[in-house]
Every structure is written in C-alpha cells, then in structure tokens.
C-alpha cells in the first residue's frame, strides 16, 4: 500500500483523470462532504462485503476517510483480499479541507 498526498490527488482530479475513489466513512459523513467515488464503509470492507468494487482489483484505487486511519485499515484489508494497486489519502478529508478549503 502506498500513500497519495492531497495536492497530488487534487492535481489528478483537476486534470480530469478518471480515478477509482473509495470513501470508507459512514453514509452521514459521506453526505456531509466528499470528493466523489464509491461509498464502501470500513465495516463492509472488514467483513469482505465489497461486491460494488470487486471489479477494481487490478486497477488503482484510492481510499479516503476523515483522518486517514480508517482508510489505512481499509487499504490493508483490500490488499489482503487481492487488490493490487491501493493508495491511501494522507490526512483524509481533514487534510483536504485544511489544504483545499
């Protein structure tokens, strides 16, 4: 598992790159503020209920949460179940809002 910075992710989004973003927060957190992607709460990943993203196993996926802790857990679990190109957003949405406003 590797990390991606807020500035690198923002640059890639601004360039129009199609990214596979996975928000591992809870639905209410996602609804409050998100940067897109698929909502798959950490609990679903930990119980391997990942049907909505199973077709991404060989593609780059970028996990994010509020602070980077849940997405770190999710990233490690995704690697355990066969995902090969997992990135974790450093600092999560807290860092995003701090740096991007």
Predicted regions and their residues:
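Rhodanese-like catalytic fold shared by cysteine-dependent sulfurtransferases
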Residues: 1-20, 24-62, 66-101
């Amino acid at each position: 598992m590797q990390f991606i910075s807020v500035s690198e992710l923002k640059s890639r989004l601004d360039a129009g790159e199609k990214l596979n973003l996975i928000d591992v927060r809870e639905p209410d957190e996602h609804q409050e503020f998100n940067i897109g992607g698929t909502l798959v709460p950490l609990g679903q990943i930990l119980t391997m209920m990942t049907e909505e993203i199973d077709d991404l196993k060989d593609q780059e996926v970028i996990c994010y949460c509020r602070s980077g802790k849940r997405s770190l857990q999710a990233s490690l679990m995704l690697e355990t179940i066969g995902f090969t190109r997992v990135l974790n957003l450093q600092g999560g949405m807290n860092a995003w809002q701090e740096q991007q406003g």
